[in-house]
Every structure is written in C-alpha cells, then in structure tokens.
C-alpha cells in the first residue's frame, strides 16, 4: 500500500492485488470508516491476475492511523496494516521549498523519467534524499566544508544534487549519461560543474579528484557485469580516505516488483536474493537517453554488498531502506 497527499486536500492509496477472473470492486476504509470512492479494477492480462488500484479520499494523510483496502461484497481483505508514515510522499515544506527560490525546475518530462510525476513530488523527494546524504557526509567528515569536492555520479537533473548544492557550500560536481539532464543543470545551476559521462567507464576525471562520490539509483539499474568495474572507477576518482555513498535496491524493493508484476520479477522471493546475492533483469525504456539495452532493474542483498564490494573498497556501514524507505544506502571508503 502506498499513499500520498495530493495538494494537501486528499489522500490516495494505490497498490496491487491478486484478483480472480472477474473485475473486483475495491473499497478503502480508514480508521474503521469507509471513505472515498468504490472503484472497479480489471485484472491486467499481462500481469496474470494482478490488478492495480488507486483510491482517493479527502483526508490529510498525517491523520490516518490505519487503512485497509478490501473487495466489496466478499469482504476479502487486500491490505490491513498500520499506515506507516514512511510510505508517505508529503508535499514540500517551507524548508524544502527554500532551495527552489529563483531556480528553474527541470522540464516535467525529465522529472517523470525518475519517478517524480509532479514538481512538488520532485522537490519533496529531493529534499528528503538530500537530508539523508547530508547526514552521511556529516557523519564521515564532521561537517560539509566549502573545500570538499563532491561528485554526484548519475546525477540526472539533480533531484538530490540541487538541494545539497543550494543548501551547503562545497565544490559540487555532477555527471550523467543523459545529455538533456546535464544541459538543464548547466543552464539552471551553473555553480554545479556538470558533465556528460559515458554508460561504461572511465569517468572524465583524473585520479584522486574527489573527497566524496555520491551515487543514487544507479546500481539499482546496472547489469551485474558493470557493478565492480564502476565501483573500481569510483575508487579511482576518490582521494585516499575519501567517502562513497551508493544506494541499492534490496529485498523490500524486490518484493514490490514481484507484487507489481514487473517482467522477470513475478516469481522471485527474498530467499532467491539471499541465495544469489544480486539479481538483474534487463529492460529498455526508449525514453532514457544515453543507456543501452542492458539497462534494467537490479536488486542486491546487503550481505552480498558487504562481502563482494569490500574487495574494491571497505563497506563501513549499510543503512537499510534509508532512502524513501526503499533503497539501502552504503558508506564506503578508499584506503
């Protein structure tokens, strides 16, 4: 179950359910009261008997304690659990919005490529991710000093890089395979040194260039054969004693993909990831610039990251589901 506030006036709950052959009537109940719409959802042929649902009701999400979705008539329950705040995508606060003042936000089509359907979601997600990364930087360095050279590898349109750079003085750099994203950053935020990079190593930087390299939602898509070469490339451009903050998708995200019916993930379970260590399934989105047909979805078992990645750089710490309550964040260093 996933919920968010839309324009601060209504809440939407969306998710996936296993249905029969017929359409199902879905009802949302919040704190014991049936609210909102009752809506029919047709099972999708391409997803087996999975059917998606999205139900809206006019109640701020922060007041919701418990929510469930069930089939009308039979009363078969699809969701019945505490409505956990970590699933919220809240509207940006005043503090979130401060870094956007005077900034030209990216084109909506570029936001949608990274899963931000509306500008307020882009701002809120970027702000929260930047907060987590700030905490990691401060934990390692003690503070974010203006002299720190920090690279966001796979920065895209700067969803987390922009709030970091506009809140904290440092020498900020970004690189990405998407030339449209880099053109936007160079136009909207020239204080960030952004460059186009290739889909495969090397990066366009000398050895020992950076005190820190951040990489969010990159290893979540790379094919397995590129994991260690790119990790070695990150190590190359880091100075000795530098920090790498890299995110991966773990068992939780794999379960989401399975329930959602993502091709290649329908029959995978956490024990499969535990056994394999890392699982990858290719897909090619024609709207993505700069990637090849090997671009896909990847899941990592945290123990695999600790064991295998440490052959390149020691993994100091893993924070499970640290980013948007979905992706794991790994802290590595170059000895």
Task: Give the positions of each predicted feature.
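Basic, ligand-binding patches in group-transfer machinery
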Residues: 1-90
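Class I (Rossmann-like) S-adenosyl-L-methionine-dependent methyltransferase catalytic domain
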Residues: 88-145, 156-202, 224-229, 245-335
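Nucleotide donor/acceptor-binding cores
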Residues: 147-149
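Class I SAM-dependent methyltransferase core
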Residues: 152
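A short acidic, Gly/Pro-enriched loop at the edge of an enzyme's catalytic core
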Residues: 201-213
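A short SAM/SAH-binding and catalytic strip from SAM-dependent methyltransferases
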Residues: 212-225
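A short glycine-rich, Lys/Arg-flanked "PGG" loop and its adjoining helix->strand segment in the class I
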Residues: 228-240
């Amino acid at each position: 179950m996933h919920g968010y506030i839309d324009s601060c006036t209504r809440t939407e709950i969306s998710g996936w359910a296993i249905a029969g052959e017929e359409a199902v009537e879905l009802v949302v109940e919040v704190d014991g009261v049936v609210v909102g719409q009752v809506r029919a959802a047709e099972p999708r042929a391409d997803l087996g008997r999975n059917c998606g649902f999205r139900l809206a009701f006019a109640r701020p999400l922060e007041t919701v304690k418990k929510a469930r979705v069930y089939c009308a008539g039979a009363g078969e329950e699809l969701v019945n659990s505490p409505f956990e705040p970590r699933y919220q995508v809240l509207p940006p606060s005043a503090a979130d919005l401060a870094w956007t003042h005077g900034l030209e936000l990216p084109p909506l089509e570029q936001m949608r490529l990274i899963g931000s359907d509306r500008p307020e979601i882009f701002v809120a997600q970027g702000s929260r991710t930047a907060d987590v990364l700030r905490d990691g930087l401060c934990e390692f360095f003690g503070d974010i000093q203006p002299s720190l050279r920090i690279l966001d590898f796979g920065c895209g349109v700067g969803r987390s890089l922009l709030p970091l750079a506009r809140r904290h003085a440092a020498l900020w750099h970004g690189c990405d395979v998407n030339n449209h994203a880099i053109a936007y950053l160079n136009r909207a935020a020239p204080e960030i040194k952004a460059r186009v990079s290739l889909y495969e190593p090397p990066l366009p930087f000398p050895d020992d260039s950076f005190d820190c390299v951040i990489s969010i939602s990159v290893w979540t898509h790379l094919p397995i054969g590129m994991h260690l070469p790119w990790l070695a490339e990150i190590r190359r451009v880091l100075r000795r004693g530098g920090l790498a903050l890299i995110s991966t998708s773990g068992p939780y995200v794999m379960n989401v993909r399975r329930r959602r019916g993502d091709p290649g993930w329908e029959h995978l379970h956490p024990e499969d990831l535990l056994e394999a260590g890392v699982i990858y399934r290719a897909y090619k989105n024609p709207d993505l610039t700069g990637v090849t047909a090997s671009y896909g979805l990847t899941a990592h078992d945290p123990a695999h990251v600790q064991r295998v990645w440490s052959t390149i750089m020691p993994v100091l710490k893993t924070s499970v589901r640290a980013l948007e309550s979905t992706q794991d964040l790994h802290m590595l260093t170059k000895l």
